[in-house]
Amino acid sequence: MALPTIAIVGRPNVGKSTLFNRIAGERISIVEDVEGVTRDRIYATGEWLNRSFSMIDTGGIDDVDAPFMEQIKHQAEIAMEEADVIVFVVSGKEGITDADEYVARKLYKTHKPVILAVNKVDNPEMRNDIYDFYALGLGEPLPISSVHGIGTGDVLDAIVENLPNEYEEENPDVIKFSLIGRPNVGKSSLINAILGEDRVIASPVAGTTRDAIDTHFTDTDGQEFTMIDTAGMRKSGKVYENTEKYSVMRAMRAIDRSDVVLMVINAEEGIREYDKRIAGFAHEAGKGMIIVVNKWDTLEKDNHTMKNWEEDIREQFQYLPYAPIIFVSALTKQRLHKLPEMIKQISESQNTRIPSAVLNDVIMDAIAINPTPTDKGKRLKIFYATQVATKPPTFVIFVNEEELMHFSYLRFLENQIRKAFVFEGTPIHLIARKRK
């Protein structure tokens, strides 16, 4: 099951994103700073009192070109659709506005827990003014200053109190995967073709896939899979005007729940910025990845077409050198039979554990090939390395000074580890840590 979801809503400039970042804190880890990996966030995971939850920053979905009230309406609709708990942020400096009242009326209809956070209460004298917000009819207003972190704990306490019951543990032997990509790249047709039967509605018009339904199936070897459909383009019979930004959020939720992500690209249209943005989210989330070029049957090809495509994909997705590329057709089912086996292999890579002794042999061999760098006369010393996690495989390298571990040398060590062990389709994380 997915983690419970918290939506942070409110009119522009009340501090939604600041509160979002404050709650997310350092749990949003940017492992690499590579061009093409997106840095913006509308979705993250938070934790408080041993309860984990997903968060949506609706401020990240604002359409700045849309009319003011349309932005707010869009946020409220997303919160109603997606959230288990809603945090409604208002400004203590400005008091209640017409836009606040509009959002409140929308939230009454959700029948979901709403936490009223009065932001920008930066000094004790302002606390007396927050009681005016009782007039919104959403219960006790909680004074906070998200910039300074004041009152954030009270909001988190309220979130945890209102979370649904603990979700059941999932079967770790079931491989979860999702197909992500721009609307109308053929995800629904691929799903149908993979399953061999019609389970969802397939249509050439974006906005015709109904509610997401997890689909379970077993291959001929008895391996169980759960396919998580991003769906959500059309809910309650209504197509959201800002479909692409809404689909980003849906894709990110699917990525969060997946072990392996199939990034679907439309061969007729080529690679778009949206593709790189979504792939960047999956990469940063540490998910296994396959790049799937669909509608391959529609292209006129010569002996160089596939090679040219592969080179272009590697150039456009420089942060995904580990991701295999497959050219398929949902219509003719070309190469689709290979996907379940590829997903299994990548899942195995994600769960690989390397004994410390073997890992350190590889590290020492790497140093012999390419000695550690120096900075201002001081040389980096590597004492030992150990694997600390899987999904994705994560290694801590203990050194004399973290600052001496240049990014380029860390990348060199990653490449040497990849040569020694099979990590196809999965990112691996290397972390330099000073030995104490």
Curated annotation (Swiss-Prot):
The record's section on PROSITE patterns has: G_ENGA
| Cited function | GTPase that plays an essential role in the late steps of ribosome biogenesis.
- To which protein family does this belong? Belongs to the TRAFAC class TrmE-Era-EngA-EngB-Septin-like GTPase superfamily. EngA (Der) GTPase family.
Q: Which organism is it from?
A: Streptococcus pneumoniae (strain ATCC BAA-255 / R6)
Record domain KH-like: where: 352-436
Instruction: Give the disruption phenotype, in one or two sentences.
Output: Essential for growth, it cannot be disrupted.
Cite the binding residues for GTP 2: 181-188, 229-233, 294-297
Q: Which domain of life is it from?
A: Bacteria
Q: Where is the EngA-type G domain?
A: 4-167, 175-351
Q: Which residues form a coiled coil?
A: none
Know the name of this protein? GTPase Der
